[in-house]
């Protein structure tokens, strides 16, 4: 596993349960996570992430970009840890977003954003 600093456009707020949640502009979501981790990894590999226009009403949210040598095995485990259940109400949902790395890298990366269950809280 490798890591590095990254940024995305969005907002972070605290849920009533005390957890932090990321909210992103709907139009920046490139894909949504599914139950097929291998297909999700292939999808990520085919998308060229263009720089999303920076809307002044959204913030530049710092985060950490992690890369794995075995994402097909890791994604389902991380999904469970984050409480993401594709096709069901979830506290978080996994979405593919354009990110900007510290070195100027632009890429598409999976992130966990506020899910329907959190919005109902």
Predicted regions and their residues:
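Glycine-aromatic micro-motifs
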Residues: 1-121
């Amino acid at each position: 596993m490798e890591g590095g600093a990254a940024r995305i456009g969005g907002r972070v707020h605290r849920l009533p349960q005390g957890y932090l949640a990321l909210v992103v502009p709907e139009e920046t979501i490139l894909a949504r996570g599914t139950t097929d981790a291998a297909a999700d990894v292939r999808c990520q590999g085919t998308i060229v992430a263009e720089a999303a226009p920076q809307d002044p009403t959204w913030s530049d949210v710092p985060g950490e970009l992690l890369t794995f040598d075995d994402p097909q095995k890791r994604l389902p485990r991380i999904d469970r840890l984050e409480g993401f259940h594709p096709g069901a109400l979830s506290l978080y949902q996994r979405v593919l977003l354009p990110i900007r790395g510290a070195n100027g890298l632009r890429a598409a990366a999976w992130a966990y954003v506020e899910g329907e269950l959190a919005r109902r809280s």
